[in-house]
Amino acid sequence: MGAHLIDGKAIAQQLRERIAQEVADLKAHRGLVPGLAVVLVGEDAASQVYVGSKEKMAVAVGMHSVVCRLAATTSEAEVLAKVEALNADPTIDGILVQLPLPAHIDEDKILLAIDPDKDVDGFHPVNVGRLSIGQSNGEHGMVPCTPKGCLMLLKGVLGDLTGKTALVIGRSNIVGKPMAQLLLSANCTVTLAHSRSRDLPDLCRRMDIVVAAVGRPEMVKGDWLKPGAVVIDVGMNRLPAAPGAEKGKLVGDVDYASAAAVAGAITPVPGGVGPMTIACLLANTLEACKARGAGA
């Protein structure tokens, strides 16, 4: 019997429906409309697609959506001024600066300029600190969207995570480190590994939960896994195109075929973690709006 398929697309849809209902209630009973602003600098094709998707989904759940499109030649000072204007705008609850930025703009400086209470990506050092000391836990606070979505998927399969052993493969500030912090807050016993960790297969075999976010195509094999483990594959890698094909196959960091034969539950790529990321961006924006209303 194969692993249970964790359908991130369907779960994200359910989350968006709950968000839409809460947005409607906020409008009806408190006169609040969550506002999400995305700052896009330049003409990067992938960024244009991502921003378009975020805008479409924000509008679909009833949010106020603003996309600030700036030319690639926009100066760092002008981008900072735009961020400061959005910080001061009472109709905007969430601010997201789409990365990457043009080479002449310091990404860290721009991200630091965002009001931490409007930092729906959860990348500001204040929010990183809140997560590390347990003030944020995936249900409260501005937590990076991909780890937040992964935690929701895990809880959907396992319920209470207390006492589970968990391995996070990957140490990025965007996924790996915050994922480990969230699992700690959920009372897991957590190991954080990376591509240079020794005896990685042996580590994996001892774990109830494996989160792969290392950026290496199909690195985690089925024989690395403990039977019945829950596997969350954050990877998104495009293999070289086969002769005559326009595009290569999209795969994760886990060898899906072999892993699905051993795991108890697993996310596919695509259709697993990816859809949860934008849904959690909307969830963070909603939470920021509710915090604004509470402080009014």
Curated annotation (Swiss-Prot):
Residues at which NADP(+) binds: 170-172, 195
Record has Oxidoreductase as a keyword: yes
CDD domains in the record: NAD_bind_m-THF_DH_Cyclohyd (cd01080)
Membrane-crossing segments per the record: none
Cellular component annotations (GO), alphabetically ordered: cytosol
InterPro entries given in the database record: Aminoacid_DH-like_N_sf (IPR046346), NAD(P)-bd_dom_sf (IPR036291), THF_DH/CycHdrlase (IPR000672), THF_DH/CycHdrlase_cat_dom (IPR020630), THF_DH/CycHdrlase_CS (IPR020867), THF_DH/CycHdrlase_NAD-bd_dom (IPR020631)
Record key words, sorted: Amino-acid biosynthesis, Histidine biosynthesis, Hydrolase, Methionine biosynthesis, Multifunctional enzyme, NADP, One-carbon metabolism, Oxidoreductase, Purine biosynthesis
One Pfam family linked to the record: THF_DHG_CYH_C
Entries under HAMAP family matching the protein: THF_DHG_CYH
Protein name per the record: Bifunctional protein FolD
Organism: Rhodospirillum rubrum (strain ATCC 11170 / ATH 1.1.1 / DSM 467 / LMG 4362 / NCIMB 8255 / S1)
Primary gene name: folD
